[in-house]
Structures are given as C-alpha cells and as structure tokens.
Amino acid sequence: MKMEKKNSKNYSVGIDVGSVSLNCIVIDKNREIVFESPYKRHFGKIDEEILNLIEGLFEKFGENNIQCISFTGSHGKKLAEKLGVFYEFETISQVLGALHLLPDAKSLICMGGQDTALLQIHHDGDKWELESFNANGPCASGTGSFLDQQAERLATALYEKNKETSQNQIDRILNDFICLGLKSGKPANVACRCTVFTKSDMIHLQNKGEKLEDIIYGLHVGNARNYVSTIVSNQKLGDPIVFVGGLSKNELQVKAFKAYYPDLIVPRHNTSTGALGVALKALELKREDTFDLGDLKKANLRGDIAVPKAPRLVLKKTELPDAQPSRRKFLAIRTRAFLGIDIGSTTTKYALIDETHHLIHKSYVHTQGKPIEVTQKLLKHIVEELGA
C-alpha cells in the first residue's frame, strides 16, 4: 500500500551489494534509520535478490515516496552503472555509516565475505579525513567466506541428511560452529596467514586428537592474530575502535579480537554500515536517482553480475559401488585379512580384503572432525560385523 503524497520523496535507500550478502538501509530526510533489511546471502543470484528487495521496498514505502536508490559494495558499481543511479566506494560508505552511528570513532575494523580492512579516521572539529587504509591481498584467509567453508567442513550440522544450500542451513551450521567454539577453554594453535596452511594445520590437529571446540576457537584466535600482525602491523589504533561487516556478527570472532582490543565496539546495524553510508551521501548530495521495476528487469544484470553457471555434470558411464557397508560375511578361522584405512579431512573409509584381493568388507563414513573417535568406531564395527 502506497503512502499519501504529502510524504512523497521522503526516503533515501542505500544498498550494499557484497561478495556474499545484500544489506539495505532506508533513511528519512532527517537522516534517521527507518528500515534495515535482514542480513541476506545472495548465493550469486544478485539480480534476483535485488529485484525481490526493491519490490519489497516499493511495497513497504511506495515507489513515489523514494527520493534516491544508491549502491555500494564489490558488486554495487556495475549495478549503479546499469541502472544509472548513484554509487559510492565502499571504504567511504563504511566510514560515513560508522560515523553516523558513532561520531567519535577513530578506527574501523571491517571484515566481510572476501575483504578485510582497517580504516583510521582523523577528526578536525566537525570534519574528518581518512588517515590510513590497509586491506588484505587476494588470499581469502581471514575472510567470512573462509570461515563459512571451515564451518561447513567441521560443524556437526553438516552431517544432517538435509544438505541443501540455503540461508537457514548455513545459519544453522555457523551457529553450531560458533557455539561449539565458545565451549573451548584453550584455543589450539592455528596458523591463519594462508588458507591452504590453515586448513592443513586444522586437519593435523584433528588427527592428533585435539578437541574440536579448541580447533574452532583457535581458528578465530589465529584469524585475529593474523589481522593484527598483517593489517594493523605496527600502527597504534585510536579509540573508539569499531568492528563492522559480516564477521562482526560472529560472537567468537568478537571474543578473539577483544583479547587485543578490550574496548572494541560492535554497533547496531553493524552489517549495514556501508548501506547506511551511501544512503547518507546520496541524501547529502540531494540525488534523485530512482528507477522502476521495468528498468530493473530490462537491465539484464544476470549476464554481467551473477556468478557464471555451467550445466550440471552427469556421470553417464561411471558405475559407483554401494557406499553402504557390505553385507555380513563370516570369515573362516584361518582366513588372513588385510585392512586399509583412509582417514581424510571430511570422510573416513576402510576396506578389508583377503589374500586373493577379494573385498570382504568396507565402509565409508564422515570424519566429523573426530578422526580418532570415528576410526575406533569403525574398528569396533568390523568386530561386530565379522566376529573377528
């Protein structure tokens, strides 16, 4: 339902289109936040999610009541160019949004899906300038995407039968991952300078029998340690220090950072500061950039922005053996058998063969981050099945 015309052109909309999520803020002419969209993963379907978001905004506020729709974020520039609307660089947007929430903020820790950055702000009365900026390189170490991947690999929620990729499923996995890590009393030593070495470190710790909660906490502690050593380096951070971005929702990551910065602040709207900043900038410039849904549908965003997709692979000529344990086979008293066990980072397999290379028994199960415990269960399973 549209609002009355007397309230027309009252709202400025800011949308942060990141590598992982969409975040949206709506402000009124008094710079007050009137709406924040829930944190939403786009799974590469940016065009569809933007269309759904704009449709919802038009329905909620009325198309004619919106003065400006503006974009920021890693995918925001192409969208703005296609639609002919305002765009602001995400670093400036993040600072503007953070300063609106905490006007005296001096240091801004930003951690998103693919980027981590440090922004230091110098204040001169009512004015400010970006004193220094430092960001990660092309490696995904320390980013939200890498933590998502490790959560999916380690969290017990992954081993439910329902393995669909959805917002709810990933939220469930991350919640399980974080809650388990919060139980740790002593973080394991995980090197987080490189994603490859980090994963290798974690697998090695699993194989040593380290508690899973200690590995998870160690990952977050290592993440904070790597940020301090590589991004902060020898700089002294001025207070207040503000933590924003998708990873600022992660209670375990906040805990790890507070070991270095006890007064660290996670503000309200912490995942939407970029969206807030670009909405404020557009309002300040008195921009009047809008579009209708027809323009959005004609923009053909899919070809330029959405993640490229190929046809699903199909195994047409490959025969896969049954992954379930073989049927019980009783062994003769003097049968010599040979057991091979493959303990991987995600699955554990064994095969039992006789002297003629015939398969006697096999099994394939998820490692679940507990290689020793799972291997013990498999050995017990052999005894129960074969009476060996």
Task: For every predicted segment, state its role.
Residues P38-H42, F58-T91, T116-Q120, G209, ...:
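Short beta-strand-loop/turn "lid" adjacent to the catalytic site in phosphate-handling enzymes
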Residues T198-S229:
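Adenine-nucleotide phosphate-binding core of ATP-dependent small-molecule kinases
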Residues K2-N7, H75-H122, D126, V228, ...:
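Conserved phosphate-binding catalytic cores of ATP/NTP-utilizing and phosphoryl-transfer enzymes
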Residues E36-Y39, F89-L158, Q253-A259, V266-H269, ...:
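Glycine-rich phosphate-binding loop of actin/hexokinase-like ATP-binding domains
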